[in-house]
From Swiss-Prot:
Pfam families per the UniProt record, alphabetical: T2SSF
Topology in membrane: Multi-pass membrane protein
Identification of the protein by name: Uncharacterized protein MJ0779
Subcellular location: Cell membrane
Species annotation: Methanocaldococcus jannaschii (strain ATCC 43067 / DSM 2661 / JAL-1 / JCM 10045 / NBRC 100440)
Transmembrane domains' residue ranges: 32-52, 56-76, 199-219, 220-240, 246-266, 273-293
Length: 299
């Protein structure tokens, strides 16, 4: 296999299989490749049935397969986001345990008993390494924190390790970290709430209303050209014209989806592909459904 194909395979298929394992999903390479083939085949069949242009077919395949390739990384990002959002809750439990005179190990055990999503599993692994593998606290925290792509978790591990090494009041350090994380979460939520309403209105108009209006106009022209055939010099609406309109709606809604993803998630290619797939699907469904059934209204 050529070197560039090997590199591409590692960065797509292999990387996604690793992410599935981190997510606890039993998914091997053959299953994932088969899933991609099915996802690519569905838009091909739809394009053939609807007599779409080659360009529309390519756009369908690229957007849907691209979204499928990024779904494992998106799921993993969601897992890390849940972890980081729940860390402050775990920190307050640890603070209460430490202030009551318990050790770090006992504080970690309290978090494990609390069953905090994602966080309890991490501290359970730390305790397992310390009790069963006889590793030190510093080694256990370093190993477990490096298993996750979370800057917040690594920061927490570093604070706890440095405090244990050089001394100090760990509960005060954890209070500062918990308050900082909560403030950041609140600012992020406020920023999203400010932009969400405007984005929602724009989403409805650009991905639903405009394709629907375009389809209504097309349906009207189809009905009028059929009724006045041979009477008025109105050229008939050809299948090529419908396919061209479908292509414009498809490209427009896909681009809009990619642009909408940026203010919500940042410049993340995976999210842009996923939102593009959603907006494109909504747009083309609105266009095709109305174009299919609306001519009867005008006839």
């Amino acid at each position: 296999m050529p070197k560039y194909l090997t590199t591409l395979y590692k960065r797509t298929i292999k990387r996604n299989i690793i992410l599935f394992k981190k997510l606890g999903k039993d998914f091997d390479e053959k299953k994932f490749i088969l899933l991609l083939i099915i996802i690519a085949a569905i838009p091909l069949l739809i394009s053939y049935y609807l007599h779409l242009t080659l360009k529309s077919m390519i756009i369908f395949v690229v957007i849907y397969v691209g979204a499928a390739l990024f779904i494992p990384s998106i799921l993993y990002e969601n897992k890390i986001e849940t972890l980081e959002n729940n860390i402050p809750q775990a920190l307050y439990i640890m603070i209460l345990a430490l202030e009551s005179g318990r050790s770090i190990n006992e504080a970690l055990l309290e978090v494990v008993k609390s069953n905090i999503k994602e966080v309890s599993d991490i501290f359970r692994k730390v305790l397992y390494l310390m009790e069963n593998q006889k590793l030190s606290f510093e080694e256990s925290m370093t190993i477990v924190s490096n298993l996750y792509d979370s800057k917040v978790l690594r920061m927490l591990a570093r604070i706890m390790i440095e405090n244990r090494k050089y001394g100090g009041d760990l509960s005060d350090s954890l209070k500062i970290l918990a308050k900082t994380l909560e403030d950041f979460k609140m600012y992020k939520r406020q920023l999203l709430s400010v932009t969400a309403s405007g984005l929602a209105i724009g989403f409805i108009i650009l991905c639903g209303v405009i394709p629907a209006v375009a389809a209504l106009l097309g349906a009207y022209l189809i009905a009028v050209s059929g009724m006045l055939s041979g009477v008025a010099p109105i050229p008939p609406v050809k299948p090529e014209d419908i396919s061209k309109g479908f292509e414009i709606v498809q490209m427009g809604t896909a681009i809009i989806g990619a642009l909408f993803a940026i203010p919500i998630f940042g410049l993340k290619i995976g999210r842009m592909f996923l939102i593009s797939a959603v907006t494109m699907t909504i747009g083309v469904l609105a266009y095709y459904t109305i174009l299919k059934f609306a001519p009867g209204i005008f006839s």
